Amino acid sequence: MTKNVLVSVAWPYANGPRHIGHVAGFGVPSDVFARFQRMSGNNVLMVSGTDEHGTPLLVQADKEGVTVQDLADKYNRQIVEDLTGLGLSYDLFTRTTTSNHYAVVQELFRGLYDNGYMIKETTLGAISPSTGRTLPDRYIEGTCPICGTDGARGDQCDNCGNQLDPADLINPVSKINGETPEFVETEHFLLDLPALAEALTEWLKGREDWRPNVLKFSLNLLDDIRPRAMSRDIDWGIPIPVEGWQDNNAKKLYVWFDAVVGYLSASIEWAYRSGDPEAWRTFWNDPETKSYYFMGKDNITFHSQIWPAELLGYAGKGSRGGEIGDLGVLNLPTEVVSSEFLTMSGSKFSSSKGVVIYVKDFLKEFGPDALRYFIAVAGPENNDTDFTWDEFVRRVNNELANGWGNLVNRTVSMAHKNFGEVPVPGALEESDKKILDLATAAFESVAANLDQSKFKAGISEIMHVVGEANAYIAEQEPWKLAKDDTKRERLATVLWTALQVVSDCNTMLTPYLPHTAQKVHETLGRDGIWAASPQIVEVTNESPRQPIGVGLPDPEHTYPVIMGDYKTQLAKWQRIDVVPGTTLEKPAPLIAKLDPELGETGPEWAPVQN
């Protein structure tokens, strides 16, 4: 039965081009999942966009001497190009500085406000003494007052997991310039999380199939639940849609309140741009729809607590009750799929310190599937993992080139040389049946892993089949069979069997290696688009909804989005029979081996740090 599946991918902050650490956590895993779900016949909507509000972008715009909108435009385009080059198959990748996003965020806020879950309080706000500008929570560090760990942020301590306010920190300092912030009284709207705690707890305790680290962390957050400020003293952001506030350009909604609403606003924009303005409701109002949220572990709080609380409050499901908003009852996450961190040679990625590998540089030299493969087999799925050039070279050469590439090239080359086409097999022997049965069984077991976001387990099983197929060819020695005319039928059977296993493995590798899969599809003599690629489309800031207040987006503004026609691709999660008589051409090498020296030195643009 066809399922509706929403794939919500963390919104990258628009402060620079993407490095491989960014895409290891949210990018490649979410795309593998979405591509698999499409191949399984499900109705998939994959959305994301660039997150463009908040103080960090203002600070950077000042440094670069440009307007904040110009800076957002610059990095939005760079990120769109990076993610498209990597083959991330978004149905819509948009941005937060759109009229549609502003309007949808304001609708969520109004619903929460009308239901009594947005409360107004006087709080202490952090101000930079030298600039007078508000310091965001995450730009303040100090000692955690609960566990005593240094380096706790103004919103949360990563060591103990507790939520914090900047004023709680011991010896707080600004991460921007090291000065001690001033704390002044200011009026803000807070999301009344305690009034939603019972509903949150009930929902979370039903999430038994989540990754253990995510569920444990999320439940621990409930031990110290408190109201969280959802507005800021800042002039860059979404106006607060309340009388007396909406025209105050010095107060805007908190960037994290608006960013998580992006999954919903992007879905609404996708429906509008697709010509069916109500199509988004299939993914948000139908309780049978499954919704999966992909992110790094540092964003769990906002997706397992803040966003669900917003959805519950909007539907009037907290202790204060309330009315269901105009958008209807919106689905809570089915699963929050959080990855750990990818480091580089033992160090955290840092552009300023030169510890960085940019996606665009990587793609230019190695192409997308080498990176996609490394992230799949060695990425930070359940633990922090380290990228080294030595391991990258070893995996590309030993596994991709010598394993998968070798299987494809020698199988098709021998079939082409001896028959010029897919040969007609004779009677199958036990060895033939054994390798075919192994590939057949893998479809079901790999699917079970991918359906549970166990991407490493999935690709490990596929590569096991690849290894067994290479062993089968070595055992059958078709190059010897080719020298004996009396063994021609056996040669045909062995090569037909190997071609079928190549086809099967290619199908199962398609979510991981879509670009390579398209090449193999063509190498097997097949036509058409096997694995569709995303496209960059230039659009205008049109919106089915209109926001209110000051500082709104320009309705004539143009920007790039990522979209794609994935429904017409041929790839299905099932065996595609290789048809005898199909013409085969001599294949070009599928995967180039890398110079082993690269593992010791790294490329010029990202050398190994000694």
Curated annotation (Swiss-Prot):
Which keywords does this chain's UniProt record carry? Aminoacyl-tRNA synthetase, ATP-binding, Cytoplasm, Ligase, Metal-binding, Nucleotide-binding, Protein biosynthesis, Zinc
Could you give the subunit structure recorded for this chain?
Monomer.
UniProt record, GO biological process: methionyl-tRNA aminoacylation
Keyword Acetylation present in the record's keywords: the answer is no
Where is it localised? Cytoplasm
How many and how are cofactors bound here? Binds 1 zinc ion per subunit.
Q: What is its main location?
A: cytoplasm
Q: Any idea what job this protein has?
A: Is required not only for elongation of protein synthesis but also for the initiation of all mRNA translation through initiator tRNA(fMet) aminoacylation.
Pfam families noted in UniProt: Anticodon_3, tRNA-synt_1g
List ligand-binding residues for Zn(2+). Answer: 144, 147, 157, 160
The protein's Enzyme Commission number: 6.1.1.10
Assigned GO CC terms: cytosol
Instruction: Spell out the reaction equation it catalyses.
Output: tRNA(Met) + L-methionine + ATP = L-methionyl-tRNA(Met) + AMP + diphosphate
Query: Entry's SUPFAM superfamilies?
Result: Anticodon-binding domain of a subclass of class I aminoacyl-tRNA synthetases, Methionyl-tRNA synthetase (MetRS), Zn-domain, Nucleotidylyl transferase
Q: What protein name does the entry list?
A: Methionine--tRNA ligase
Cofactor(s) for this UniProt protein: Zn(2+)
Q: Where is this motif: 'HIGH' region?
A: 12-22
Single GO molecular function: ATP binding
InterPro entries in alphabetical order: Anticodon_Met (IPR041872), Met-tRNA_ligase_1 (IPR023458), Met-tRNA_synth (IPR014758), Methionyl/Leucyl_tRNA_Synth (IPR015413), MetRS_core (IPR033911), MetRS_Zn (IPR029038), Rossmann-like_a/b/a_fold (IPR014729), tRNAsynth_Ia_anticodon-bd (IPR009080)
Q: Where is this motif: 'KMSKS' region?
A: 348-352
Q: Kindly report, in one word, the top-level EC class recorded for this enzyme.
A: ligase
What residues does ATP bind to?
351
The source's superkingdom equals Bacteria
Q: Which family does it belong to?
A: Belongs to the class-I aminoacyl-tRNA synthetase family. MetG type 1 subfamily.
Primary gene name = metG
Q: Does the keyword Phosphoprotein apply?
A: no
